[in-house]
Amino acid sequence: MTAVSAAREISFRILAKVDAGGYASDLLRGETVALESRDAALAETLVLGCLRYQSQLDFLIAHFAGRPQPKLDLEVRIALRLGIFQLRYLDRVPAHAAVAESVELVKGARKRSAAGFVNAVLRKVNRAPVGWPDRATELSIPAWMLERWELHYGPAVARGIAEAALAEPVAYVNPATGRRQDIGAQSIVPLLEIKPGMTVLDLCAAPGNKTAQAIAAGARVTACDRYPRRLAEVPAEAARLVLDAAEPLPFSTRGETARFDRILIDAPCSGTGTLAGNPEIKWRLQPSDLFRFQARQRKMIERALPHLRPGGLLVYATCSLEMEENEAVVEGFPVLATHSRIPGRDSGDGFFAAAMREGR
């Protein structure tokens, strides 16, 4: 019996949890903390690689199994994805380890009857080029998502976005805060044009990277979020406040509405600009979700604008590439300018932002 390495066992477990609705980055952070750095790095490579290339891997399962769209239990499919990813996409993993440990993972998941099938399929895997059946499989992206990007951005930019989602994200550090922060995310707070001493309301502030940027620019920040646990990550220099999504913003006393010089709405969104680091979004998101996000996002702007001082500036931002969450959300509001970053065209994640001025 072959022993399964900690990295592969944890990867197998995390991928099953992601399929059940978990988030890969959170699960990796929690489950690899006790591993040696080499094993933790391998687990991250396996989990994120299998998610990034999921549709290619599923096509390759059928290709090497000699069956179109074989019906497989989840545990068997995950073991095959892990095995094929190691055999075709990684260079320094011994083939015998990739095959033998994938077989043992299936046995350990009480799918012993499928062990022979997994072994037979993985032993056929080679690195010969295959003909992908369509662009969506080639780029490992849902067809509906690729098609809408092609319509909105054009085929070349859409391909660049999809290819960027297959790459490992580059780690950036914000020199003003010393925090790890994507280069695209760093571009949002400067749109607020903060001057020292200004008051800033940062809605949806966790994990606090943009809050830290505003503080570094000299602002006095009130940082808000719905989740107390996440709000704990926000810099202590900010006034921190937990919001109830069903209640109005709690900034009015004795009939007086509190106002801020600047408001940042870093809105919850689909996250399609962050697929390189959060590849499970590709397989989880549905077109109808965009309209659900849109309704919440417009409501956030409507609730926040009354708290902006006359002449103040509000910046609405998402890490989405979708019109429904961006241009369509800010339509009808007093927009001064918009800003966008597109993966493949620009470094880092994708973002949209719109600056609005309150003239009352």
Where are these regions (language model features)?
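S-adenosylmethionine
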Residues: 1-360
